Amino acid sequence: MKVALAQINATVGDLEGNARQIVEAARRAHAQGAHLVVAPELSLSGYPPEDLLLRPAFMRACAEALEGIARSLADCVGLQVVVGHPHQFGDRGDVRTKSTAQPLRFNAASLLAGGRVVATYCKRELPNYQVFDERRYFASGRDAGQSPLVFDCAGTRVGVLICEDAWFDEPAAGAKAAGAQVLAVLNASPFHLDKAGEREARMAERAYARLSKVFRH
């Protein structure tokens, strides 16, 4: 299995521009023989989208842009793409005027293949410390009642996690129980000294404990 990491320079709110970057990166990877392309956490919306998430029109536009990416890559036969994006179940109107409404939005990653959105995974562990305030905007994937996202790619079973999920054992354990041999972990978070080393150590810990290999992005 050949994997490409689409490390695009996303701009918050620029759905058209971010989608274009994802499509272009995926096409380049496909031309070089990649089976799987992984884009970063919330790469479609840009990170962090914050109060844009409270606008129903923005959430609908995200869903339309995601489907547009899938259609744009329909001719890339055999290519699978994982894209990070905001995801919403249903529509309760503008939550800025309904402070008591339960959040329906999720920090998600979707598998695109064959011109369509095949499956979606919702982040389970939401950071809410230092610069992170994801619980203000997102519900945990546990509330979505979803199974782990595990799919076959060139003969390898790939599980999907999102950022903070990899810092806890349960999401990786769930992916392994669903048959994952490899994890694709989407990330987007601020840099600090030795962060790369910390991530590498944590991914190695997850790999040794749960899986044979881990891809991180």
What are these regions (language model features)?
Residues 1-217:
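Enzyme catalytic cores with a strong preference for nitrogen-chemistry domains
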